[in-house]
A protein has these predicted regions:
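Short internal beta-strands
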Residues: 59-67, 184-189, 206-213, 268-276
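Active-site ligand-binding patch in enzyme domains
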Residues: 105, 111-247, 255-258
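Short, charged, surface-exposed secondary-structure boundary motifs
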Residues: 13, 73, 98-99, 194-196, ...
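A structural microfeature
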Residues: 1-2, 128
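Conserved histidine-centered catalytic loops in small-molecule metabolism enzymes
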Residues: 280-308
Length: 308
């Protein structure tokens, strides 16, 4: 009789949208509402979802997973039961955990869900030794590249190191797909990245992580000063958490990607193997595990999961 989903932080939750989508509200007192995540019971950016369920006298609520957010964490279920509503918990729990993996990682591990992504040649390089232009050298095919833009639209932030910006001058935006541009997180220890690089434009917010202090930029650029040491990956995760970033896709370069692998600070890795060879160049990161392999025409996509 109705359905809904949570479109954006600060906007109505899935339960609210689902209830409002029902044209004949007289059906609600004999309905069942199915939710992937426990309905909230607190006043945050939006009113409690529990209040609306109770108001419309919906008698049955089926919950996929309990909300790990300490503000909720079972209080929503308790509130519904106290108001005479039958609550069933744990239906399709694995599927709901997968659906909400970014949210759960953010609240349980106090860091974003981290996805590593790169493309490498058949002989294991992510870039040739030299190139003529300050732009990416394409390794993967057009289908693979479109998929990358879809991924960018699904994550809250995208991260690259200094050398990737200097070598490729990437836009780090969403093209070839519909969606919002992710927040750009850029590592720039010594201040090599100037305002004429694409990552410094106003098409998206940029968080610049640097060892420099007292830097001033335009309003869309935030500078975070840290010491670049062995704890850098943890500091990046902490800064992302500080700004409420629930997911990050890391697109390079080799040193940046390898540092997250060696710190075991990643959740997924998505590796394209393109149908090209360089014979020499920048070696691809080294990652262990048994991937799932997907064919994308002449490309291969290797998918790794780093489960606890």
């Amino acid at each position: 009789i109705g359905e809904g989903w949570h479109r954006k932080a600060g906007e109505p939750h899935a339960e609210v949208n689902a209830i409002h989508s029902v044209k004949d509200k007289s059906l609600l007192p004999k309905a069942t509402i199915y939710v992937s995540l426990e309905p909230c019971s607190h006043h945050g950016k939006t009113p409690p979802c529990c209040d609306l369920i109770i108001k419309h006298k919906i008698p049955n609520v089926v919950v996929g997973t309990v909300d790990p957010n300490s503000i909720v964490a079972g209080t929503g279920i308790k509130r519904l039961i106290e108001n005479g509503i039958t609550v069933t918990v744990g239906i399709l729990e694995d599927e709901c955990n997968e659906l909400n993996k970014r949210f759960f990682t953010f609240h349980n591990k106090k860091r974003p869900y981290i996805i590593l992504k790169w493309a490498e040649s058949l002989d294991g390089f992510i870039a040739p030794l030299t190139k003529e232009k300050q732009e990416p050298v394409w390794i993967s095919n057009s289908i693979s590249r479109q998929l990358v833009h879809k991924w960018r639209s699904e994550e809250q932030a995208i991260l690259v190191g200094t050398q990737t910006v200097i070598d490729d001058n990437p836009k780090l935006d969403v093209r070839d797909w519909k969606g919002e541009n992710p927040i750009r997180i850029v590592l720039d220890r010594t201040g090599k990245i100037t305002n004429d690089f694409h990552v410094m434009n106003k098409k998206a917010k940029t968080i610049l992580i640097t060892a420099q202090e007292n830097l001033t930029f335009s309003e869309n650029i935030i500078a975070e000063s840290v010491i670049f040491d062995i704890q850098l990956t943890k500091k990046i995760a902490d800064i992302s958490y500080k700004y409420g970033i629930q997911s990050v896709i890391i697109e390079g370069g080799r040193q940046t990607l390898q540092s997250f692998i060696e710190a075991n600070l990643w959740d997924e890795a998505r590796v394209f193997i393109g149908a090209v060879s360089f014979n020499d160049g920048v070696k691809a990161p080294v990652i262990n595990g048994i991937p799932k392999i997907v064919k994308l025409k002449e490309d291969q996509l290797k998918l790794y999961n780093n489960h606890d």
